[in-house]
Amino acid sequence: MTKHPVFFISFFLIMAMIGAAGADDLQPIQLLPPQIDGGKPLMQVLQKRSTSREFSTDQLPPQVLSNLLWAAYGFNRPDIGKRTVPSASNCQEIDLYVSMAGGLYLYDARTNRLEPILNEDIRALAGKQPFVKTAPVNLIMVADFSRMGKYSPEEKDIYSHTDAGFIGQNVYLFCASEGLATVFRASIDKPALAKAMKLREDQKILFSQTVGYGKK
């Protein structure tokens, strides 16, 4: 794997500093270009896919984080606006938030950046299990129903949950390939988390997925 020591140091300096900064001072994080030429063979990855609820507090290196987010919800055909996962009528209604110690970010796949949302560590709100508040990354999948105008409320709910499931499986497969631990969860205090995230009424939290290294 190509190493980028300068970026690595800069990334974690940013993560360490933003805890003392105001929300307006929180800066976007430009992710490294995803590496799409590595990984284990598919059949081996399927054999290794598993759920884990034991995580170390070790941070994910910048390249691994970038690769993870691209695998989860990046554009694999950017010229036609298509992603690594399908969505109902290509609504692309899911927003993927990234909760880390330094704050809450929104993954912008088009610019390959993390856009700052909250200068707070809200990892503890991303689930009800103890490991959630100390694991390095919690992905939060939020449906934006304003992008699904033609569907009924019931259809929006069904399709968005299905689309989030595709993202979750991509994360599972990536983690199996990279030797990471992960668990896909619906056990969330959704009203409390939605309030902290300042979501609109037509946005709905669906699932959260914890990612990190297994506990040593």
Regions found by a protein language model. Give the residues of each.
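Short coil/turn connectors at secondary-structure junctions
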Residues: K133-P136, D202-K204
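Bacterial N-terminal signal peptides
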Residues: I9-M17
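Small-aliphatic-rich amphipathic alpha-helix that forms the alpha element of a beta-alpha
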Residues: R49, L68, L96, V137-M148, ...
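A glycine-rich helix N-cap at a beta->alpha junction
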Residues: L199-K216
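N-terminal amphipathic, basic helical "cap/leader" segment at the start of enzyme domains
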Residues: A21-A135
